[in-house]
């Protein structure tokens, strides 16, 4: 029997252990998609308690606390930080089998040197020790990033953002690149009641009057170039439902005018507007050699009462099951026909889409850029041992796992970087297993190079930050 969360955690063969120790463990990190705050990084934010560092904003934890019967007061409510931590400690033993159980203990080990199991009996001692350490040196946001050997962070930013803290970080002595990620979801959601207000913010940020669809595209382009000048090389689109509908420039202009004036926009018109605007952005991203990310098939804010009382991103989302194959293929093809398909990373929240994406990406590789179209790492509800291995196996079966750009945190927490370790251990177990079973040669130079590529070097070459 293996020790709980011991040195060989998730490593199920001698080859896996060797690959991890010699090739994966000490590789740097490129976190090319996350939700960390550039302001908090710049200010080297510190944390008053482990609750603030661990539970504030973490809807992954909130979901299973509710499932464990914890009242909302101890999750997002006005309970003290100590009460909230003890509520989490009560939940953790019930979470065996959930990745949060592993991540919780991995983070306790790596950040705080705590190897005890977190439960109601150990909660008081762990509360005391973690808080003492957090008050000392070396636990600010920048410190945690540096300790994790992170080289690049890409945040998630609205096109109207001034990127003030990205610029301040660039001018500082902080050695990690903190770069903006262009997330124009509000600019594509033309049926939203807030669309017109967002266009006004785009006007203000760009310094351009927006009164027509063409002037809207011009303002978007100005913000893309602003992000580019600030070091941005990635965009991100939350496409909860993948859509595609051809339209003319004239019809897109009509739809834009309706949305800007607050008129009702039908779903069919929304599809046309999104398609036309995405096609335009594809060309712009391709020109600037950006990587475009699509996060597909999330079903958001499913609980109306909770959305009304707590708002979005509070743990009431789930997996969608919309069909993606035809609209996704048509959108990629429409860009490719114009030679305007940028580097693209595709993620779906629905694991039933794994083989759809894994097979589709190789229909659009260009024979020049290795892995130009990527099947993105297991995302959100799939960010588990099984989910990661399923994604990696689908990619291996359909394409080149060796060209995979690997892991990202997609996190709001500065303590989440051990998730890269979790991922890397699974990569080594998968590849090591192939060698152990005679499916790959026992060539450590070859296998080690593949491991290093997936952990770091492929992303370094792909993004060229």
From Swiss-Prot:
GO terms for molecular function: glucuronate isomerase activity. Pathway: Carbohydrate metabolism; pentose and glucuronate interconversion. Signal peptide: none annotated. It is an enzyme of class 5 (isomerase). InterPro entries: Metal_Hydrolase, Uronate_isomerase. Its EC number is 5.3.1.12. It catalyses: D-glucuronate = D-fructuronate; aldehydo-D-galacturonate = keto-D-tagaturonate. Keywords: Isomerase. Gene3D superfamilies: Metal-dependent hydrolases, uronate isomerase, domain 2, chain A. Disulfide bonds: none annotated. GO terms for biological process: D-galacturonate catabolic process; D-glucuronate catabolic process. Pfam families: UxaC. Belongs to the metallo-dependent hydrolases superfamily. Uronate isomerase family. NCBIfam families: PRK02925.1. HAMAP family: UxaC. This is Uronate isomerase. It comes from Bacillus velezensis (strain DSM 23117 / BGSC 10A6 / LMG 26770 / FZB42) (Bacillus amyloliquefaciens subsp. plantarum).
């Amino acid at each position: 029997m293996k020790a709980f969360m011991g040195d060989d955690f998730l490593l199920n063969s001698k080859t896996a252990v060797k690959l991890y120790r010699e090739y994966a463990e000490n590789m740097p990190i490129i976190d090319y998609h996350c939700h960390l705050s550039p302001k908090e990084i710049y200010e080297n934010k510190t944390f008053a308690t482990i609750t603030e560092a661990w539970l504030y904003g973490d809807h992954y934890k909130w979901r299973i606390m509710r499932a464990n019967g914890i009242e909302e007061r101890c999750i997002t409510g006005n309970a003290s930080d100590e009460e909230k931590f003890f509520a989490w400690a009560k939940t953790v033993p019930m979470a065996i089998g959930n990745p949060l159980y592993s991540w919780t203990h991995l983070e306790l080990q790596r950040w705080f040197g705590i190897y005890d199991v977190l439960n109601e009996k150990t909660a008081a001692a762990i509360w005391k020790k973690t808080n003492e350490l957090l008050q000392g040196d070396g636990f600010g946001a920048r410190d945690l990033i540096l300790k994790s050997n992170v080289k690049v962070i890409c945040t998630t930013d609205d096109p109207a953002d001034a990127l003030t803290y990205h610029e301040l970080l660039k001018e500082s002595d902080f050695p990690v690149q903190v770069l903006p990620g262009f997330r124009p979801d509000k600019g594509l959601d033309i049926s939203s009641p807030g669309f017109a207000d967002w266009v006004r913010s785009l006007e203000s940020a760009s310094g351009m009057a927006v009164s027509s669809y063409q002037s809207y595209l011009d303002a978007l382009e100005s913000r893309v170039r602003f992000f580019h000048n600030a070091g941005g090389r990635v965009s991100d689109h939350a496409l909860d439902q993948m859509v595609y509908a051809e339209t003319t420039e004239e019809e897109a202009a009509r739809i834009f005018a309706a949305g800007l004036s607050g008129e009702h926009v039908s779903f069919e018109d929304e599809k046309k507007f999104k398609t036309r605007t995405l096609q335009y952005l594809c060309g712009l991203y391709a020109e600037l050699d950006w990587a475009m990310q699509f996060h597909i098939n999330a079903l958001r804010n499913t609980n109306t009462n909770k959305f009304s009382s707590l708002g979005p991103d509070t743990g009431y989302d789930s997996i969608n099951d919309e069909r993606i194959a035809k609209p996704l293929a048509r959108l990629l093809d429409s860009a490719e026909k114009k030679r305007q398909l940028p580097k693209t990373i595709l993620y779906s929240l629905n694991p039933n889409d794994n083989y759809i994406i894994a097979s589709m990406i190789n229909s659009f590789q260009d024979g020049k850029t290795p892995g130009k179209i990527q099947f993105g790492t297991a995302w959100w509800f799939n960010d588990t041992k099984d989910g990661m291995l399923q994604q990696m196996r689908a990619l291996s079966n359909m394409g080149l796992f060796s060209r995979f750009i690997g892991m990202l945190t997609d996190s709001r927490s500065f303590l989440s970087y051990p998730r890269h370790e979790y991922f890397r251990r699974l990569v080594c177990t998968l590849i090591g297993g192939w060698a152990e079973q005679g499916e790959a040669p026992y060539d450590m130079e070859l296998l080690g190079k593949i491991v290093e590529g997936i952990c770091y070097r492929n992303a370094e070459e792909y993004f060229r930050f």
